[in-house]
């Protein structure tokens, strides 16, 4: 690593709230990531005193199409976005891996993390606990990527009480009635869970439609059209990070 690049990275880390930077901290950023973060700083895209760009919060009722739209975003900009790995007390489903899909922990461990203030947001659904830790988000943003948080309205309300300062996007169906067939099509939901999800969907949509709660609200009647709206919202932020538009490494 050249002295010039080393000092550039040191400057970036100091600007992002670090008073000291060890050699291991500095080498964690590639030259491309350092340039991206420098561009972000110049264009106001850095997240306050946090290291890295502002995260992206995606919210909406289950079955509204968040995952499909999010997948199109990450497929197009492969090296621009990263996902935080949430904690949960539920058991792993077939094909899920600890540390990849979720951090699977016991209820006692989860409660201890809550008491320690480790979570930016946490909630209980279907008798299971879910939470997003600050460390999980920082692990992504420290690499110069935009961290995506896929959370519910309760989580959004909690995040708004923190200093995370993300962009908030709400994705909703045209009608609440559209959600039930989508949930059933998954084949992973029980009758009870479907009823629970539908019962809260109307309240979530009401919160999403309230002016000021989200930066943009997308009504998902067509995946391609909805993705175009999300892409248009995020593109200036992506450009400001100076990351290759095709997601290729420099």
Predicted regions and their residues:
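Conserved P-loop
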Residues: 94-112
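Post-Walker A alpha-helix
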Residues: 69-71
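ATP-dependent NMP and nucleoside kinases share a basic, alpha-helical "lid"
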Residues: 80, 108-118, 132-187, 234-235
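Short beta-strand-centered segment that lines the nucleotide-binding/catalytic pocket of NTP-utilizing
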Residues: 78-92
